[in-house]
Structures are given as C-alpha cells and as structure tokens.
Amino acid sequence: MESWVFERGSLTRRLKAACGADFNVRVIRQGFAHPFPDEALLLKLRSGRRALVREVELRSRERRLVLARSVLPAQTLKGAGRRLAHLGNRPLGEILFASRRPRRHGFEAALAEDRHWRPAVRAGSGSAGPVWGRRSLYSIAGRPLLVAEFFLPAVLSVPESA
C-alpha cells in the first residue's frame, strides 16, 4: 500500500498503466459547494466561499480502487483552468499532469476512518475499517486546487510494478 500512497508522479498514469483499458472514472458528485473547514483553510478561502467539489471513483472495470475528492476554487477555474470544470468522466490527473508537472505545495498521508466519509461514498467501499488516504495541495498557473485520495482494499490487487 505504501507505494500507492506515496506515489510522487501521476496516480492516474500509474493506474492506467496497470489496468489498461479496464481503467475508468465514475463521477459520484460534482458541483459548487462549501468545502470542509480544513479544506477552505488550506486553500485560503474566505468563510462562506464556495468551490467546485468533485468526488469520483477510480476503477478497474467495476472494481473501486480509489475514491478521490477535488476542491477547486472559482479563481482556479478561470482562463486555462476553465477546462477543469468540464472533465466529465476524464480523470483530473490526466489534465493536471498533462503538459508539465503541477507544483505540489503540500502533502499529507494518514489512516482515515470510513465513518467520516459521506454515506453514499462509504457504501460498497469494501472497507471494514480505516483506509489510507493522502491529500495534496497543487497550483496550476499560480492558482490552488486540493486533491484527496483514499485507497480502497481492492487497490492491493493492482500490480505494484506499474
């Protein structure tokens, strides 16, 4: 699990290499919402500000491997960042790591209790307890975005060498 959690490059690229054509993204929810207080603090958003919140599953066929939550402030969605609001079933990492490495400003990893997840996300996670999660603060063209990823037990069945 450690090599997945502490992957420095694109998690999307690594999963695609390991899963091939079976890799897919399912959007759980996407829309403007109030970020969690700790997310707003990391993004330096004023109280009450909304941001684009996107929650997805990264999957191999129907098998859920990773749950991801991205928070993109309105300022990040301007100019070249506008395309980030219209990803559909494309993975954010595909855009984030496309041209050059995005700038990572912070990285946290911890065990996350599934009782803290939204019920819709928790359902069918395959987890009977805590799972490893990580959170990274990136900037694109000087504008921030926050990405959190939670590694479900099924990710252990994906080849580590990918």
Swiss-Prot record:
Catalytic reactions on record: chorismate = 4-hydroxybenzoate + pyruvate
Subcellular location(s) of the protein: Cytoplasm
Residues that hold substrate according to the record: R54, L92, E149
GO BP annotations, alphabetical order: pyruvate biosynthetic process; ubiquinone biosynthetic process
EC number: 4.1.3.40
Enzyme class: lyase
Gene Ontology CC: one annotated term: cytosol
This protein's record includes keyword Calcium: no
Pathway(s) this gene product operates in, as recorded in its UniProt entry: Cofactor biosynthesis; ubiquinone biosynthesis
Sorted UniProt keywords: Cytoplasm, Lyase, Pyruvate, Ubiquinone biosynthesis
Molecular function per GO: chorismate lyase activity
Entry-linked InterPro entries: Chorismate--pyruvate_lyase (IPR007440), Chorismate_lyase_/UTRA_dom_sf (IPR028978)
Record bears the keyword Transcription: no
Job description of the protein: Removes the pyruvyl group from chorismate, with concomitant aromatization of the ring, to provide 4-hydroxybenzoate (4HB) for the ubiquinone pathway.
Family, per entry: Belongs to the UbiC family.
Name of the protein in question: Probable chorismate pyruvate-lyase
Organism: Methylococcus capsulatus (strain ATCC 33009 / NCIMB 11132 / Bath)
Gene (UniProt): ubiC
